[in-house]
Amino acid sequence: MAGTVNFAQVSMVLKHQPLGIWLSLALIIFIVGFGVKSAIVPMHTWLPDAHPEAPSPISAMLSGILIETALYGLTRVLYILFEPSTFQMAIAVLAVLTMCLANILALLQQDIKRLLAYSSIAQMGYMLIGVAAGTSYGIMGVFLHVFNHSLLKGMAFLAAGSIVHEAKTRDIENLKGIGRLMPVTSILSLIHI
């Protein structure tokens, strides 16, 4: 289509093209590809299963770095290669679905790490709303939220790992009274929330 792989040159060519079948297909492939990595609903199913299986430091990096990196990639590709009007509605719909479904599923969890995983997915929905807004303030809000989420969700997974190590369970029902046993860790968990 553009005869080059240089993003700046591809952008100059594609932004003046009508959205035909090939550009639509490319847009869908980018959204699905980055959507899987950033755990956007309905491509989120791997993340709640990955967090309970991973050690807590890996969960902290997975939630604090990996999914945000994919969101950054999605944002860059969308805004460099496409006109915002071509993707804003689709991204907004995915954002609302991601926020709503992930929050509902988070409330139904008994495993502390699955709860945090669904919380991370919901946060991706909040960030996607900024991407869909298509304004400079929306994008600034996205990256501020990315920074905050990276720090705080990483801290939450590390705190959850300490709690699980001490309590020998991830079941939230069995963690009653853990605040008296681990006050500093519990306070750090409250800061995240």
Positions of predicted regions on the chain:
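Hydrophobic transmembrane alpha-helices and their helix-loop junctions in integral membrane proteins
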Residues: 1-191
